[in-house]
Design a protein with these regions (language model features):
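Residue-level detector of Asp-centered blade-edge/turn motifs that repeat once per structural unit
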Residues: 37-38, 99-100, 152-153
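Predominantly soluble domains enriched in secretory-pathway, periplasmic, or organellar proteins
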Residues: 98-99, 125
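Multi-bladed beta-propeller domains
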Residues: 8-29, 67-93, 125-144, 175-192
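A flexible loop/linker signature enriched in serine peptidases of the S9 family
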Residues: 1-7, 23-29, 45-67, 83-91, ...
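Short basic/hydrophobic patches in alpha-helices and adjacent helix-turn junctions
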Residues: 156-160, 174-177
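C-terminal, well-structured subdomains that either form a transmembrane helix-short loop-helix hairpin
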Residues: 146-147, 154
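Conserved beta-strand position repeated once per blade in WD40 beta-propeller domains
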Residues: 32-34, 94-96, 147-149
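Hydrophobic beta-strand positions that form the internal "hydrophobic ladder"
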Residues: 39-43, 104, 157-158
């Protein structure tokens, strides 16, 4: 649960901190930042600030983006909402952009931002070119699927799942083809 949640960008080469009222509003919780593969957009999750902790199960995060020019140290002036949750009655977290820049993998769950504790948490994929959801339901189970990451060439993902017992988390691998279709996931081998 975030009582305060803002985003800043640290340029370690120039030793400067980039921030904006767009990313540190008292009216919203901003979290889970990630850059587009070309570094020209910052994707993140944002939810309207509400009374916490008494209303924590009503916090729902949208997926947003902001243009950035890291060479000049300039952040855009307008936040774009990529996926709105008001029609989904869900919360979104962990946006990760594929190395090709075409796909955004993220987690959808009922509320909040710590999805591993939500049995309903599922992985979802959004095609940033066509601006449409891609069906990757083959990756999901009755238990939580949560944190995930792309391989460096963008044809594989690794993700956390509690599908075996619902009590502990294991890592699964799945192939993603050039159209964003997911193959059947398999348990990450633990021994040779």
């Amino acid at each position: 649960m975030d009582l305060h949640s803002d985003i800043v960008i640290l340029d370690v080469q120039k030793n400067i901190l980039l921030t904006s009222s767009q990313l540190s509003s008292a009216d919203a919780y901003e979290t889970f930042p990630c850059f587009s593969s070309d570094g020209k957009k910052l994707y993140f999750c944002s939810a309207p600030a509400i009374s916490l902790p008494d209303s924590f199960n009503f916090v729902q995060y949208n997926l947003c983006s902001l243009d950035v020019d890291l060479e000049k140290g300039v952040l855009g002036s307008r936040i774009d909402t990529v996926i709105r949750v008001d029609t989904l009655n869900a919360s979104l977290s962990f946006p990760k952009i594929s190395p090709s820049g075409r796909f955004m993998l993220y987690t959808r769950h009922a509320y909040g931002n710590f999805s591993i504790w939500h049995r309903d948490a599922d992985l979802c994929m959004y095609d940033l070119q066509s601006q449409r959801e891609i069906d990757i339901s083959v990756l999901n189970s009755e238990e939580a699927e949560s944190f995930h990451s792309w391989s460096s060439e963008g044809h594989w993902i690794v993700f956390s799942s509690r599908r075996m017992t619902g009590l502990f988390t294991c890592l699964y691998l799945a192939h993603i083809d050039s159209l964003g279709h997911a193959g059947k996931p398999f348990l990450l081998p633990q021994k040779s």
